[in-house]
């Protein structure tokens, strides 16, 4: 029987908290002027690699998102050294940052569903309009 919540998941959860604190307090890069949120961390089974998923507050500008990810990648060594001080791990994992667009996609899907429901309600109120198609 496999463990449902093994060591990689527990380390990832703690690492998510620590990286969020580091990004909030320690990183002073002007390319990260927008608020950065750590939405998730995935660890490899041997705890040597971590995929860090981040979102930005004003993520409408594609260039700003790419610049933010690039800034995080360039600061990954510094973040990794601070992680080593904050967490007692035998191996501090190599960090790779990715933009997490799941929240944006979720909001887009929610807006689509809302607009379809609204359009359907309008068609029920005015059934004559649908016969013109």
UniProtKB/Swiss-Prot annotation:
Q: Which UniProt keywords apply?
A: Cytoplasm, Ribosome biogenesis
Q: Which Gene3D superfamilies does UniProt cross-reference here?
A: 3.30.300.20
Query: Which GO MF terms does the UniProt record name?
Result: ribosomal small subunit binding
One Pfam entry name: RBFA
Organism domain of life: Bacteria
- Broad class of the protein's primary localization: cytoplasm
Q: Which GO terms describe its biological process?
A: maturation of SSU-rRNA
Q: Which InterPro entries does the UniProt record give?
A: KH_dom-like_a/b, RbfA, RbfA_dom_sf, Ribosome-bd_factorA_CS
Q: Read off the SUPFAM superfamilies from this record.
A: Ribosome-binding factor A, RbfA
An example of a Gene Ontology cellular component annotation for this protein is: cytosol
What are the subcellular locations of this protein?
Cytoplasm
> What's this protein's family per the entry?
Belongs to the RbfA family.
How is the quaternary structure described? Answer: Monomer. Binds 30S ribosomal subunits, but not 50S ribosomal subunits or 70S ribosomes.
Stated role: One of several proteins that assist in the late maturation steps of the functional core of the 30S ribosomal subunit. Associates with free 30S ribosomal subunits (but not with 30S subunits that are part of 70S ribosomes or polysomes). Required for efficient processing of 16S rRNA. May interact with the 5'-terminal helix region of 16S rRNA.
Protein name in the entry: Ribosome-binding factor A
Organism equals: Klebsiella pneumoniae subsp. pneumoniae (strain ATCC 700721 / MGH 78578)
Which gene produces this protein? rbfA
């Amino acid at each position: 029987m496999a463990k449902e919540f093994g060591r990689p998941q527990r380390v990832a959860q703690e690492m998510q908290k620590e990286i969020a604190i580091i990004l909030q307090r320690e990183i002073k890069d002007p390319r990260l002027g927008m608020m950065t949120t750590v939405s998730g961390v995935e660890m490899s089974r041997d705890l040597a690699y971590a995929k860090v998923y981040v979102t930005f507050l004003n993520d409408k500008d594609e260039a700003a998102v790419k610049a933010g990810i690039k800034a995080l990648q360039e600061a990954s060594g510094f973040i990794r050294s601070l992680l080593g001080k904050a967490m007692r791990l035998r191996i501090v994992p190599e960090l790779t940052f990715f933009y997490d667009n799941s929240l944006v996609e979720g909001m887009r899907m929610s807006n689509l569903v809302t607009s379809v429901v609204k359009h359907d309600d309008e068609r029920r109120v005015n059934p004559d309009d649908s016969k013109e198609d």
